[in-house]
């Protein structure tokens, strides 16, 4: 992981001791907007629930610290506070990064999810194999009832039944592997996205609640001392 400081100047040096009402309104709008956009919008190469999206503020500038993968690190960053915009520049040979849905897993979450997937696929395998075996057993009962007077046919049918059971086992196993190959990435994406939503929702709420404090009762240094919620 590579951490990047994204800084932008809110106040010139002459405004260090005199913050105007326009500056207060700008900060009230800008800081929560960037907090939520960095955490939610997929166009930003941040999407990582375990990274530090921390706000560092003082009288001269505000900085956002966020982490990206080394191969998705932008070459330049620019922020326009007046338009509430944040732009990135990437190399021509590099594709625009998209969220890595597998990264938000911790070790314990990934181990638990793998156990659940293993149980789910074994359950599918058991159901598929039991259905095939039950169908063949039903056929064998019909055969025994209608052809009980031919012993040689009993032996042939028993051999045929063993072959069919083995083939059904192979078919169930191949079906299980194909399901795992096809649906495992999708299930991982769905699970990681669902696990991400409450954190992102709380992140936005807590950022807005902790940052949007009336400037008559606090200061930038008090805002800077607030704990990070990411």
Swiss-Prot record:
Keywords: Cytoplasm, Membrane, Nucleus, Signal, Transmembrane, Transmembrane helix. The chain crosses the membrane at residues 27-47, 118-138, 150-170, 172-191. Residues 1-16 form the signal peptide. The keyword Signal applies. It is found in: Cytoplasm; Nucleus membrane. It is a multi-pass membrane protein. The keyword Membrane applies. One of its GO terms (cellular component) is nuclear membrane. This is Uncharacterized membrane protein C17A2.10c. The lineage of its organism: Eukaryota, Fungi, Dikarya, Ascomycota, Taphrinomycotina.
